[in-house]
Every structure is written in structure tokens, then in C-alpha cells.
Amino acid sequence: NGDSQRETPRIAATFDGVMSVECSAPPSEIFALGHDFEPAMASIWKRRNPGWQLSPGEVQYVIPEEDFGYPAAVTLDRRARRGSSRRVVEFKMARDLSAWGDQFTDAAPADYVAQVMAQMAYTGFTDHPAELVVLGPFFEAHTYVIPFDEYVAQAIHDHCRVFYASLADD
């Protein structure tokens, strides 16, 4: 049970053995377009955040089981840095911004908030809020600023530990 708008039921069914993983299925067009537009979104973010630098591409972190009681891996769309400061930067495409809530708030969809919260928790980049850039219709870009929340991060860890332990029972 998770908060993903699209993947949670399929992933859960795959882990339960009800459904096989379809590795040969092509990614959806919006998913592919999202990756195609990441360099443009990175450029927008850099222009709006002078003094910060971005990694040239995705950055992956592998977290050993002993860190949180379960193994994990996380991939950031970009890692931002300014001096010794680091922050998570994530990019998304949206065909319809109405699903993203009020543009003038930082009320991003729960599954994306959970994603960047986990990214901050796993990387330790918690001193600066994560920034979630969404590129909508007509190339309208909005940045959601998501501060680290220790309570939410702990809840994510708790759920992941329970899930990881459940795999041993299967």
C-alpha cells in the first residue's frame, strides 16, 4: 500500500507473484518526454537559482541494509550544490496542472512529496528543501519547495522496514 498514482498496485502485485514484471514494455510517452525535457528543466532551474550548480545528469545512491534496517537505492534527477550545501532537485512533466493543486502553494501530489522526502532521507540532503520542478502545458514551469520533515521520513522508513520484513515471510 503506497501513494503512487500509477505504480503501487502493479509493483505490489509483482512482489506478491500475482503479476510478472514486463521488462520489454516500452515506457509511456509522457515518461519518455519527461526524460527528454530534463535538460531543459535543469536549465530553467539553474537560471532561477544562481550560485547553485547541478550535476550533469542523474545521481544514484545505494543505501546498505544496516543504515535503515532495509536496503535501498535512490536516483536523483539532479544533485544541486553550492559550496558544501546539497539539495535534491526532481523534474516532472504534467499534461494537466490541475492535478498538481494550487500553483501558488507547495502542495505537490503526495506521491511526489513522498519521493523527494525519501530522496532527502536516503542522501542526507536535509539542510535545504528539495525542489520539484514541474513542466506543464505551454512549457509553464513551476517549482514546488519541499522542506524535510523528520516525522514523514520516519514513517517512510517504518513502512519500508515492515515491507522488507514481509519479503522474508514469502
Residue ranges and their predicted role:
Residues 31, 47-76, 80-168:
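Nucleic-acid nuclease catalytic cores
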